[in-house]
């Protein structure tokens, strides 16, 4: 039986990164019916909560996000726990690990990317 879920892909910028990750995860469940709703340019947890509360989703919901501002992430985590909505902090966890390794605080500025021509090194191990 096909189960319907809604995933809110939330971003403080365009939502492109988080939407791609949600689509990649969704592809692993071909029998599931996943609706992805992208929320862009989010600045507060209240914006997300208000949007979710105004929806009438037919099944379970989850929030995947790439919010950079630590305070907003914390507020969002608390609000979603109260609402019993599972969430995945995709960018905050990555920034935390890098901050520890670099012994530096992240800027928490939405939209920053490295455009210096540096490309990652790819290795095909197959």
Regions found by a protein language model. Give the residues of each.
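Non-catalytic terminal and connector segments of soluble metabolic enzymes
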Residues: 1, 32-33, 73, 77-87
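Metallocofactor- and cofactor-centric catalytic cores in central/energy metabolism, strongly enriched
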Residues: 37-67, 71-81
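Structural motif
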Residues: 10-13, 65-70, 92
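Short helix-loop-beta junction
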Residues: 24-33
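Conserved beta-strand scaffold positions in the cores of enzyme catalytic domains, especially
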Residues: 36-39, 87-89
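Ser/Thr/Gly-rich flexible loops in soluble cytosolic domains mediating phosphotransfer, phosphorylation
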Residues: 81-126
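Short, surface-exposed connector motifs at secondary-structure boundaries
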Residues: 3-6, 32-34, 56-61
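N-terminal accessory targeting/assembly segments
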Residues: 1-21, 25
């Amino acid at each position: 039986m096909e189960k319907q879920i809604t995933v809110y892909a939330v971003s403080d910028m365009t939502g492109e990164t988080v939407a791609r990750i949600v689509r990649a995860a969704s592809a692993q469940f071909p029998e599931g019916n996943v609706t992805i709703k992208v929320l862009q340019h989010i600045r507060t947890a209240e914006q997300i909560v208000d949007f979710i509360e105004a929806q009438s989703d037919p099944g379970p919901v989850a929030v995947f996000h790439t919010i950079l501002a630590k305070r907003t992430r914390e507020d969002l985590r608390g609000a979603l726990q109260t609402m019993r909505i599972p969430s995945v902090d995709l960018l905050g966890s990555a920034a935390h690990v890098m901050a520890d390794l670099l012994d530096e605080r992240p800027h928490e500025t939405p939209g920053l990317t490295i455009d210096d021509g540096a490309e990652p090194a790819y290795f095909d191990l197959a």
